[in-house]
Structures are given as structure tokens and as C-alpha cells.
């Protein structure tokens, strides 16, 4: 009789464990996340893969859509996610203010909303994970000032500043961080033109400005978008000289794409404020999981040993929690660091 009870209890325990394991699998399979991005190529593909891979490893289903840069299409896509009843929404906003329409609709439906790379403006989301774009602008600004000081013995000269889409928070921060440094030096003239993240617009800006005046440096909001076409345009204008030669135009940018790292190695460009692109998505997955688990999160420093983005800063702002991952100041001196996403 005792042996029968032991066997029965053991079988019941195994059945319970099996049932719990199936429940866990079902719970994971029931997590559906809608992911809306402007595109899924270049840096955006790296961001998406950084999210998709760990999400799918948890058994989550990821639904992805692209807007092609059309803010209204992005809103329509997100409304479709809401109608489908997804468990969370992740977006790379086309329009930082315009995205608030979708954020409000998701909130009314009880769906947590996260943004990557670019924050919302005018509404609160659960969290935004992004590079410290202001820091990146600072780093590029300091590099330009150092070059001008070395060239002229003091910080003076002319800088062409090609922005992204200034309706987006990320471009505003990249501009603000750079301006904060450059504006300290009254003898540096800055020519600022909006490039809207479009390579052809960047080319036209370079042609228009350099056809009528000389510049000492060019700062670009995205080397992924502008660097290769800018170098090619300088060659076509017969204004290209490699680093170290007379006439070299110093080129600084943000992102750290592989194409620009190659140009830095060649001496065509000089500095990049590298983003921890693949880590954006994985960090969002981590915080969505915390939300699903009912875990509270608190402001403060986030440290991960060995990560180039560490330490990061988690802050509560008027647009919700923001996790600012540090950018890496890249030059010819540290270009081969394997941790740089452009080297991966």
C-alpha cells in the first residue's frame, strides 16, 4: 500500500510538472508583439534583429511592418496591431509628435507601447531605448573643435552641419549636442541644412554649399545615410583630400555604420559617435518581459560589464522612461574594436 501511494504521488507530481511546463510554453506562445519601423534595411535591420532574435527565443511571435517613412501609414499599421490585440507594441517613430495618436489608442486598449531609437514628443510611452544622442553630438562636436584648433592654432573655421529629420527627437538631440559644443566658439561659423535622412538631399546640400564656399569640416547626423555619398561628391567636386594631406575636409558623424568605418580606415572620414544598435532591441525585450512579469523598474544607472554602452542611464521623463545607452567616440585609434556594431 505504501509503495502504491509513493508511485501515485510521484505520477501526480510528474503530471503537475508537465502541466506547468505546457502552461509556460502556452504563455510564451501567447505573447504577440507588433513592431513598426520606417524600414528594415541598414541600421534599422540591425535594430529589428536585435529585438526579433531574443523575442523569438522566448517563444514570442513578432509581427513586423514598415512605413517607408510615411508617418500616416505607420499610424494605420499600429492601429491594425491594436485591432489584432497584440500584447505590446514597439515602434521606431516616423514622427515623434505624430506617433502620440497611436500611443493614446494603444493606451485606451491597454497595450503597453515602447519606442526604439527615437522617443515620442508630447505623450508618455512605457519606455524608449535609444543612444544618448546628445552625448553623440557632443563627441562629434569636440572632435571637430580639436581638428580646427590643430589646423588653425585656435577653434575657428567653417562647418557644414547636415541634419536628419528635425521633426524627430533623435535629430533634435544630435543637433543640440553638437551645437552645444560649437556655439561655445564664436569664430566657428556653422552652416546648418536639413537632410531629412535622405542621401540625395545630403548630396545636393554638399554640392550647393561647397560650390560657393570652402568648409573645414562636415558634421552629419547619420553616417549610414550620408557618409559614402558625401565622400563621392567631394571627389566629383575635386575637393577631396585624404586625412593628413592639405585640403582635407574633416568629417564627423553619428551611427558608426560599417561603410563609414571603412572610410575612416581609408582616411576619407575621421570620426563617428557609434551607437550600440544591436542592443536597442534586446534591451526592449528585457523590459517588456519585466512588464509582463509585473516587475517595477526604477531610475538610475544600468551597468553591464563589457558592454560599450555601459553605463546607461534610466530616467523618468515627460515622455516616459528613457534608457540612454552611451555612444562610443570612434576614430582611427579604436576603429578595430570588435564591439563596434559596424565591425560585426
How would you label these PLM feature ranges?
Residues 1-11:
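Bacterial N-terminal signal peptides that target proteins for export
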Residues 10-21:
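Bacterial N-terminal signal peptides
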Residues 22-28:
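Sec/Tat signal peptide C-region and signal peptidase I cleavage site
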Residues 31, 162-166, 170, 181-182, ...:
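Hinge/cleft segment of the Venus flytrap/periplasmic-binding protein
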Residues 36-49, 64-73, 95, 118, ...:
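Hinge/beta->alpha junction and helix N-cap segments in small-molecule ligand-binding domains
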Residues 88-108, 178, 195-263:
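Hydrophobic alpha-helical
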Residues 97-135, 158, 257-263, 269-270:
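Flexible loop/hinge segments that line or gate small-molecule binding clefts
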Residues 221-229, 264-265, 271-296:
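Extracellular/periplasmic ligand-binding modules, especially the Venus flytrap/periplasmic-binding
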